[in-house]
UniProtKB/Swiss-Prot annotation:
It catalyses: Release of an N-terminal tripeptide from a polypeptide. Residues 110-619 form the Peptidase S8 domain. Disruption phenotype: No visible phenotype under normal growth conditions. InterPro entries: Peptidase_S8/S53_dom (IPR000209), Peptidase_S8/S53_dom_sf (IPR036852), Peptidase_S8_His-AS (IPR022398), Peptidase_S8_Ser-AS (IPR023828), Peptidase_S8_subtilisin-like (IPR050131), Peptidase_S8_subtilisin-rel (IPR015500), TPP_II_domain (IPR034051), TPPII_C_sf (IPR046939). Induction: By cadmium (at protein level). It comes from Arabidopsis thaliana. This is Tripeptidyl-peptidase 2. SUPFAM superfamilies: Subtilisin-like. Serine protease of the proteasome pathway that may function with the 20S proteasome to degrade oxidized proteins generated by environmental stress. Belongs to the peptidase S8 family. One of its GO terms (cellular component) is plant-type vacuole. Its EC number is 3.4.14.10. The gene is TPP2. Pfam families: Peptidase_S8 (PF00082), TPPII (PF12580), TPPII_GBD (PF21316), TPPII_Ig-like-1 (PF21223). One of its GO terms (biological process) is proteolysis.
């Protein structure tokens, strides 16, 4: 997801619970990438989704539980401290005389405009003023994001007139269209498009081969949710007008009929009136059922002898029938060749780009998946010739767009997108990458994408810049990859007074610059600093044209990263022009050693990194030290005596480790870029380093170190015993003795957190009289008492005037887990109090971070006084995860309260079922070389696994893949993607590492899982990968007992108890009773749910759901084997009156008939053999109804008959043979006898007669269908002659015969009723019956019914409904599955 911030949207809360549950934005808002915040003028509307602790799909939002607010309001998000001096633009960094008073800070028109696109803070403006030709010229930046709009303001040309955008690529595959189908044009220049539409190609288009490749796509699959919403609204308005017009006509027709016939007694007139009424009712009903799935666009691809060309037919998007025609389209080719783009229609105003891959077999239509990417690109490089103050940081740089935010997933990044983007960046020889996306990670500096980036940085000298995250203000909240990867420059978000006053339009700006409140902080869990540098984290920058505005305000580390990236482009522009060697190692060192520190305390570096970057100083540094080796100093830290784990810094935060001296081994390994000369660079490398500690009283280091190419180790002693409570930050760094002015060559962060212990009983800790102003943060560290599992907190505020908004975070770091974080963003009036409940991990240090939002309270002179009290509670159990093994035995659970007396109220509920599936097919293939060849030259392979499952009823299902889910950066697997489709190939769900539930109707489904990697052995191991299909079920509440036999005897029910401190108490958890288990559950399935034990101290209600209680734990039950079915043949000794020879003859006959049914009829030869066997069997078993029914079934299975009229006549004759073979009188007499059978023979006879009835009815039904189709094929009209009239009488005669045996309006036979009404020109009645049939279909959609509906609508002339149904046909019955 990307890294943008959270907003308060029209007062709608975005709430996130303690366990990181899903959160949503209000319908008036748009979810933004995790690093950015949208402006008040255009809010993106999207579902915000949790990814572990703070993840939204494709786009990162800062937090949940926080009231998201438009960034331009006075309550805009931001926080921490940082500022920049200079000319009234940036604001001061830290304190001092330079800080102008708030009262004296004023903007004029020019400084206001400049504040919208901040550059002064990082001194980019003065650098360009001093070096106008070093404005990014000669530098190419790859923007890894949601894609950007090449037509957006400022993204057309560079400052020196070159094309701004070099390429636009969809790396996700979300815009891919299968164009492998080849067609030829007829003599009129017509071709059939993939949608079935007839298209006219332009005669002037060059196509030497005459081959046209066709494909199609629903256009909403290319649009963002917000654009789709806008287009739907406009289309609905137009559709409603047309529908209302047709309703008026239908009502008038009914009125005219009633005026002519005051009394309707004649049966025929009654039917006529019913038909007119049905039309009115049908049209009204359509308005309620309307659901716009979007127009279909047809795509045509051809080779003009030089390049691949693309044209689209977008008539379905246009109101004007003469607009959007294929022949009028100006053909495009791959963007990088001609740099041209198209616009779908005037309605959407959405720009797109076309790229052709795989020799024309794949067309990629590239659109952005959110405005985020365009905004990011604008901050980095926009050029506005008419207003230079609105320029991006590097207006002379060129860019390529690498879309990693998948449109199918709401702009979530995918492994496929990330890998392809890196391949594209290297193919284009990009100098820089900006990536404003990220996720929480289990392990820092780990994973496949991290490995690929590190390889590119080392081998190709690629400089990779990324956002640090928006999960602050707590420490250890940096996200992957930006804040956790050594080879990536991670950027925090800073706001200056000028930005606050101008871009955010606050009433009164802060007196000095500061870090936004939500900007993520370090260190990483392995001790690395996390944030490298800071840069302005907000801007009013360009957005796509489909937003119907030129620019908007967004803020987040998503905005800070391109600001820094653009600044680095200025440095590279100068370095290239002046011949200074370019290396990510030297550039990073220059940035870190020249940044302006923000704040006065050492631990401020955990917030801002080395400080606010300064372009001019970094440039001077690079010039001065250009002759020194380009070396990266890799740091490996181990606790003495231990080889694992290896970390990149020293991070002490748990009680024991923080209260004793420890010795650490530091290994420093210089790393050169690949290709460095052994003799000229590696062997001569030798540096005499002076080692320093920022506080020798705490961190002691050797004085000197001689470092050579093979590296060197040294020891460090850390003594925290004299430190007070709180966070303490130190650094160990190495200085070149011969050139100390170079500054630190490497730094080793040392973070020590000394927690408070909670000694009193009951365990309560309080923090009194804390004083807050805007942006102020108070951090408290508490050693969570052993035995605590949750905490109840109260925050009291007073002493202020206007309302105050706060961020409250708690965070704990546990081994091999993502940081455990709880967060809330309450608003307080004065005085007021609020209570909170959050889970805790026993014995682990917990950070409590309380921050007054950076813009909250600006303009007020009154500080906020806060009292915060935490009371710890806990019910500990001997097993946190419970597994019931499927037997009848209960599980014993021991509970204990170590802190104080607690209520023990266990509640156990199973509410989901997980069914395991193995793949029925595994296809491994090599992908095309165009997009999927790595830097190493290795070709990526794809493994497609196919699974089948069936739902007996509609249900919400979610795929669950334990090996792969919930990890995108911190995994060695490259990519995963799944889609779920029905037997019609309609796709119901798509997903990746974070699967979500999807509502599916009853039916059979296919899940295809797509995995990518270049390692064939790894993919081979996954060919039998187990996938679980999880679905909701009715709650099963498990019983609790105080004795082991309780589940059987029903005695000793356990309800509740009071746990005394230190006294254990046990109870038994019984398995569910067999009658409560879901029916037809396969063996190996699991029922899953939650169990809770404790209860809130202030809650007197009886909780019925474990999730209502403070802490819940997973519980699962293995479904036991089903009861074996009895052998019915063995159980009942059959009494048969037939002789052995008669039974043998019967078995032979039935076997022959079965064999006939299994014969294929695909070729003429096979059909001839089938007919011969039919003739032979009919002569052998004359008038045997099951045989004749099987022959009729065989005829119906042939769908490719050449002469359709002859085929239907053959069906009629076969049906007649079935009808003639049945003694209808005997059958009628038997069915009228309702006596229940009393023996086996009578039961068999009853079943036989019922089968015969069904065969008779089916024959009559198929005969009627065939007769109707013959009439349709011949184009007969009512009253065309005696022969036709006689044929109609035969149809009616057949229909009336069918009504004697079955309900002709039932789902099985209703189609014939529809055709009958159609023949009688009662089209409204026909539609009513057909619509009822479709509504009653509770399984996979029947294509023939929808085709019949389309025919009826076309015959009536309701063109708006015809168009609507044709679009739905593309959804329900696509010709093939979409590409991955």
């Amino acid at each position: 997801m990307d890294l943008s911030l959270q907003l308060q949207i029209h007062g709608a809360l975005i709430n996130k619970g303690p366990s990181c549950t899903s959160y949503w934005a209000s319908s008036s808002s748009l979810s933004l990438p995790r690093d950015f915040i949208s402006s008040s003028t255009f809010l993106l509307h999207r579902r915000l989704r949790r990814r572990s602790c703070s993840r939204s799909r494709g786009i990162r939002l800062r937090r949940s539980g926080f009231s998201a607010m438009p960034c331009s309001s006075s309550d805009t998000l931001t926080a921490s401290r940082v500022g920049c001096g200079g000319g009234g633009g940036g604001g001061a960094v830290g304190g001092g005389a330079e800080n102008a008073s708030v009262a004296n800070f004023k903007l004029n028109e020019s400084t206001f405009i400049a504040s919208l696109m901040p550059k002064k803070e990082i001194r980019a403006d003065c650098f360009i003023e001093a070096h106008p030709e070093y404005d990014g010229r000669g530098v190419v930046i790859a923007i890894f994001d949601s894609g950007f709009d090449p037509s957006a303001a400022g993204l057309h040309v560079t400052s020196d007139g070159k094309p701004k955008v070099l390429d636009v690529i969809d790396c996700t595959g979300s815009g891919d269209i299968d164009t492998s189908t080849v067609v030829k044009a007829n003599e009129d220049g017509h071709i059939r498009g993939a949608s079935g539409a007839t298209l006219v190609v332009n005669s002037s288009w060059k196509n030497p081969t005459g081959e046209w490749r066709v494909g199609s796509k629903l256009v909403y699959q290319l649009f963002t949710d917000d654009l789709t919403s806008r287009v739907k609204k406009e289309r609905r308005k137009s559709w409603d007008e047309k529908n209302q017009e047709e309703i008026a006509k239908a009502v008038n027709n009914l009125y005219d009929f009633d005026q002519k016939h005051s009394k309707v007694e004649d049966a025929k007139l009654k039917k006529t009136r019913e038909d007119l009424q049905s039309k009115v009712d049908f049209l009204k009903k359509q308005a309620d059922k309307y659901e716009d799935k979007g127009p279909v666009i047809d795509a045509v691809v051809w080779h003009d002898g030089e390049v691949w060309r693309v044209a689209l037919d977008t008539q379905s998007l246009e109101e004007d029938p003469d607009s959007g025609k294929l022949a009028d389209f100006s053909p495009l080719t791959n963007y990088r060749i001609e740099r041209k783009y198209g616009v779908f229609s005037r309605l959407d105003a959405c720009s797109f780009v076309a790229n052709v891959y795989d020799e024309g077999k794949v067309l990629s239509i590239v659109t952005d998946s959110s405005p985020h990417g365009t905004h990011v690109a604008g901050i980095a490089t926009a050029h506005h010739p008419e207003e230079h103050l609105l320029n991006g940081v590097a207006p002379g740089a060129q860019i390529i767009s690498c879309k990693i935010g998948d449109s199918r997933l709401g702009s979530m990044e995918t492994g496929t997108g990330l890998t392809r983007a890196l391949i594209a960046a290297l193919e284009h020889n990009c100098d820089l990458v900006n990536m404003s996306y990220g996720e929480p990670a289990l392990l820092p500096d780990y994973g496949r994408f991290v490995d690929l980036v590190t390889e590119a940085v080392n081998k190709r000298r690629l400089i990779f810049v990324s956002s640090a995250g928006n999960s602050g203000p707590a420490l250890t909240t940096v996200g992957a990859p930006g804040g956790t990867t050594s080879s990536i420059i991670g950027v925090g978000a800073y706001v200056s007074p000028a930005m606050a006053a101008g871009a955010h339009s606050v009433v009164e700006p802060p007196s000095e610059g500061l870090e936004y409140t939500w900007s993520s902080r370090g260190p990483t869990s392995d001790g690395d600093l996390g944030v490298c540098i800071s840069a302005p984290g907000g801007a009013v920058a360009p957005v796509p044209t489909w937003t119907l505005q030129r620019r908007m305000l967004m803020n987040g580390t998503s905005m800070a990263s391109p600001s820094a990236c653009g600044a680095i482009a200025l440095l590279l522009s100068a370095m290239k022009a002046e011949g200074i060697p370019v290396s990510p190692y030297s550039v990073r060192r220059a940035l870190e050693n020249t940044s302006t520190p923000v704040g006065d305390l050492p631990e401020d570096k955990l917030t801002t990194g080395q400080g606010l970057m300064q372009v001019d100083k970094a440039y001077e540094y690079l010039k001065q030290f250009q002759d020194y080796p380009c070396v990266f100093y890799q740091i490996k830290v181990n606790l003495s005596g231990k080889t694992i784990p290896t970390s990149r810094g020293i991070y002490l935060r748990e009680g024991t480790a923080c209260r004793q001296s420890t010795e650490w081994t530091i290994q420093v390994d210089p790393k050169f870029h690949e290709g460095a000369s052994n003799l000229k660079e590696l062997v001569p490398f030798e540096e005499c380093l002076e080692l320093h500690s920022t506080d020798e009283g705490v961190v002691r280091v050797p004085d000197y170190l001689l470092l050579t190419n093979n590296g060197r180790g040294f020891n460090v002693v850390v003594d925290p015993t004299n430190l007070g409570d709180g966070v303490h930050y130190f650094e160990v760094y190495g200085i070149d003795c011969k050139a100390p002015e170079r500054g630190p060559l490497f730094r080793i962060p040392v973070t020590i957190i000394i927690p408070k212990t909670v000694a009193n009983q009951p365990p309560v800790i309080s923090f009194q009289q804390m004083s807050f102003i805007s942006g102020h943060i108070e951090r408290r560290y508490i050693e969570v008492p052993h035995g605590a599992t949750w905490a109840e907190a109260t925050m009291r505020t007073s002493g202020f005037d206007t309302t105050r908004r706060f961020y409250i975070d708690t965070l704990q770091v546990c081994p091999l887990r993502r940081p455990i974080k709880w967060e809330s963003a309450p608003t307080f009036a004065s005085p007021s109090a609020k209570s909170f409940v959050f889970p805790v991990v026993s014995g682990q240090t917990m950070e409590l971070a309380i921050a007054q939002f950076w813009s909250s309270g600006l303009g007020s002179r009154e500080p906020t006084i806060v009292d915060f009290e935490i009371e710890f509670h806990g019910v500990g159990v001997d097993k946190e995860e419970l597994l019931l093994d499927g037997s009848e035995a209960p599980i014993k659970v021991e509970a204990e309260a170590l802190l104080a007396s607690e209520k023990l109220v266990p509640i156990a509920v199973l509410n989901k079922i997980r069914v395991p599936y193995q793949p029925i097919d595994a296809q491994l293939k090599t992908l095309s070389t165009g997009r999927d060849r790595l830097l190493s030259g290795k070709q990526i392979l794809a493994l497609t696994l196919t699974y089948k499952f069936k739902l007996e009823d509609s249900a919400e299902v979610k795929p669950y893949i334990p090996l792969l889910n919930n990890r995108i950066y911190d995994t060695k697997f490259e990519s995963q993607f799944f889609m779920i489709s029905d037997t019609n190939k309609r796709v119901y769900a798509m997903g990746d590492v974070y699967p979500e539930s999807s509502k599916l109707p009853k039916g059979e489904y296919k899940l295809q899982l797509y995995l990518r990697h270049e390692n064939v052995e790894l993919l081979e191991k996954l060919k039998q990968l187990t996938v679980f299909i999880e679905r909701n079920m009715g709650e099963i509440r498990l019983n609790l007992h105080s004795e082991p036999d309780g589940p059987f005897t029903g005695n000793g029910a356990f309800k509740s108890s009071v746990l005394m401190p230190g006294v254990k108490e046990a109870f038994y958890l019984g398995p569910p009773t067999k009658d409560k288990l879901p029916k037809n559950t396969p063996q190996g399935s699991m029922l899953v749910g939650e169990i809770s034990y404790g209860k809130l101290s202030f809650d007197e209600k009886e909780g019925k759901n474990p999730k209502d209680n403070p802490v819940s734990y997973p519980i699962s039950y293995v479904v036991p084997p089903n009861k074996p079915e009895e052998d019915k043949k063995a159980a009942s000794a059959p009494t048969c009156s037939k002789s052995v020879s008669e039974r043998l003859e019967q078995e032979v006959r039935d076997t022959k008939i079965k064999f006939l049914g299994n014969l294929k009829q695909e070729t003429e030869e096979e059909r001839s053999e089938w007919r011969k066997l039919c003739t032979c069997l009919k002569s052998e078993y004359p008038d045997y109804t099951p045989l004749l029914a099987k022959i009729l079934e065989g005829l119906l299975s042939r769908s490719d008959a050449g002469d359709k009229i002859s085929h239907h006549e053959e069906i009629i004759e076969a049906a007649n043979e079935v009808v003639r073979s049945v003694d209808v009188d005997e059958l009628a007499r038997f069915l009228l006898d309702k006596t229940e059978p009393e023996d086996d023979e009578a039961e068999k006879l009853k079943k036989k007669m019922e089968v015969t009835r069904d065969q008779l009815a089916d024959a009559l039904y198929q005969k009627g269908l065939a007769m109707a189709r013959i009439e349709n094929l011949k184009g007969e009209k009512e009253g065309e002659g005696e022969e036709e009239s006689s044929q109609k009488d035969k149809f009616e005669e057949n229909f009336k015969e069918l009504t004697k045996w079955v309900d002709v309006k039932s789902s099985k036979y209703g189609t014939l009723t529809v055709l009958r009404e159609k023949r009688l020109s009662r089209l409204g009645t026909a539609l009513k019956v057909l619509d009822d049939l479709i509504q009653n279909e509770n399984e996979t959609a029947n294509k023939k019914l929808y085709e019949l509906k389309l025919d009826l609508l076309e015959e009536i002339g309701w063109s708006h409904l015809v168009t609507y149904e044709k679009q739905w046909m593309q959804v329900r019955f696509p010709k093939s599955l979409p590409l991955f």
